């Protein structure tokens, strides 16, 4: 229930009557009825109701003409494309329920600021307020267009524009240069009625695809006035320019030639914490705005989308795949591309009949399941051990630990207190690792070894730990497989 209805249920509530003399006077049921009479019956019906209700004429002639031009009846609920095609073939469409209370689509995707946005910090700099006028009050004061262009040319992080009418080519050229040359993200929100004039200005500049890749243009309307018979569409009257998240210019100045040279305007430059409400307002406007595709309206090809499968597309959204993907699209642009492909696919199958598999949902489910089918991995071929290595020497078979020591598990090599295997074989992998770790330690200094002792393989000791460098002979051991004499261990110790 509405707050006014809940307040009426309160026992202690006193319904105070707010008249036209009160400052809080805003809504009047009699004025709403007069507005409905104007839109339904014209000027004559409006004047009769005003006279009957003893109201003052609250609408000027210009407002009455503008309201009648902005009024439009509610559109009928549009069914799916296939149902619409069948309805055309069988019988004409019948009127459905109004969208005023039963909307066809209530959940819409919030457009992301995919090019980036400034961090919202507690401190935005020194708060200052500067007023500029046209014509200038001081002799050397800059004109309003100069102030705006300097802000855009000095931008380094982000540029955000909210404007009712944007037709000045010089200002837009500065925005294009900032987006193309300095890679500054640009977001522009225009009034829906001024979009066509903005596109006319863009067509005169002969823009290329790569120059507008960092520019996002969207449109919004006013709040509007909803009635049972239709809706009055409002307009966007806000005008401000935000740069780098720390300064904003607002006022009556529009980005047009007339505002710069003909009209009298004010421009208020705010810095620091004063721009916090403008930051919130811009993000709210951007969330309810509609996309204006510059590539489509200007006839530009745009970036060609890659035909990724659904599995790969889901992975590319993950930031950890950014280095692998290379030239990966921003998430917002990828979602727009997917929605565009979905609309084109829906338009191509408009006249086709539904299949036996459940229609579009069944086809998507089947495509999703097919993407998840795993492919059997092909393992690399392993070359067999050469017979020469397996041939016995001196009537004794060679242990596989000498031919392929890497495939032996660590648990299968029990070691004794001196780093040797239990069967008398030394483990060269662990001995080498232990030797290198001690050799490159900062605390161990290796003195010069006499030439008489360096030629013979010996067992070196680092910090009371022995590391055998050669094969030591143990009784009953099979370590001597070369047939040579037994190597005598040396007692060389490095302190």
From Swiss-Prot:
Region Disordered, annotated ranges: 341-362, 384-495
Residues with Phosphoserine modification: 4, 477
Superkingdom of origin: Eukaryota
TM region(s), chain numbering: none
InterPro entries: FAM83, SACK1
Modification N-acetylalanine, positions: 2
Keyword Acetylation: yes
Bias-annotated ranges (Low complexity): 447-458
Chief subcellular location: membrane
Keyword annotations of the record: Acetylation, Cell membrane, Membrane, Phosphoprotein
Subcellular location(s) of the protein: Cell membrane
Subunit structure and binding partners: Directly interacts (via DUF1669) with CSNK1A1 and CSNK1A1L.
Protein name (Swiss-Prot/TrEMBL): Protein FAM83F
Provenance organism: Mus musculus
């Amino acid at each position: 229930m509405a707050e006014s209805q809940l307040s009426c249920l309160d026992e202690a509530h006193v319904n105070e009557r707010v008249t036209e003399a009160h400052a809080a006077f805003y809504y009047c049921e009699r004025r709403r009825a007069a507005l409905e009479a104007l839109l339904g019956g014209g000027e004559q019906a409006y004047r009769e109701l005003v006279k009957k209700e003893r109201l003052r004429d609250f609408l000027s002639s210009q407002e009455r003409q503008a309201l009648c031009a902005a009024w439009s009846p509610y559109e009928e609920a549009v069914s799916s494309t296939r149902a619409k095609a069948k309805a055309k073939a069988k019988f004409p469409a019948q009127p459905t329920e109004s969208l005023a209370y039963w909307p066809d689509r209530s959940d819409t995707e919030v457009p992301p600021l995919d090019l980036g946005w400034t961090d919202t910090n507690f401190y935005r700099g020194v708060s200052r307020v500067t007023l500029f006028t046209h014509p200038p009050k001081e002799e050397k004061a800059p004109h309003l267009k100069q102030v705006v262009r300097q802000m855009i040319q000095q931008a380094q992080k982000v540029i955000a524009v909210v404007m009712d009418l944007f037709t000045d080519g010089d200002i837009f050229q500065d925005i294009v240069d900032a987006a193309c040359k300095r890679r500054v993200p640009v977001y522009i929100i225009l009034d829906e009625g001024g979009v066509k004039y903005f596109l006319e200005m863009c067509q005169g500049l002969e823009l290329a695809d790569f120059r507008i890749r960092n520019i996002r243009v969207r449109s919004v309307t006013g709040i509007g006035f909803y009635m049972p018979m239709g809706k009055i569409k409002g307009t966007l009257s806000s005008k401000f320019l935000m740069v780098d998240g720390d300064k904003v210019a607002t006022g009556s100045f529009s980005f047009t030639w007339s505002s710069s040279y003909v009209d009298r305007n004010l421009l208020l430059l705010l810095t620091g914490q004063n721009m916090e409400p403008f930051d919130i307002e811009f993000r709210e406007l951007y969330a309810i705005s509609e996309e204006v595709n510059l590539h489509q309206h200007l006839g530009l090809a745009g970036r060609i989308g890659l035909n990724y499968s659904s599995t790969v597309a889901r992975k590319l959204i993950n930031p950890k795949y950014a280095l692998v993907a290379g030239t990966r699209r921003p998430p917002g642009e990828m979602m727009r591309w997917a929605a565009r492909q979905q609309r084109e696919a829906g338009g191509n199958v408009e006249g086709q009949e539904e299949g036996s598999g459940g229609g579009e949902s069944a086809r998507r489910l089947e495509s999703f399941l097919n993407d998840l089918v795993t492919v059997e991995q092909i393992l690399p071929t392993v070359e067999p051990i050469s017979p020469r290595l397996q041939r016995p020497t001196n009537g004794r078979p060679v242990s596989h630990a000498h031919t392929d020591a890497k495939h032996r598990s660590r648990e299968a090599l029990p070691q004794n207190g001196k780093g040797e295997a239990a069967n008398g074989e030394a483990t060269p992998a662990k001995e080498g690792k232990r030797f290198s770790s001690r050799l490159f330690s900062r605390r161990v200094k290796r003195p010069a070894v006499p030439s008489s002792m360096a030629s013979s393989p010996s067992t070196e000791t680092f910090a009371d730990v022995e590391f055998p460098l050669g094969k030591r002979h143990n009784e009953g051991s099979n370590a001597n497989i070369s047939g040579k004499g037994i190597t005598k261990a040396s007692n060389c110790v490095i302190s």
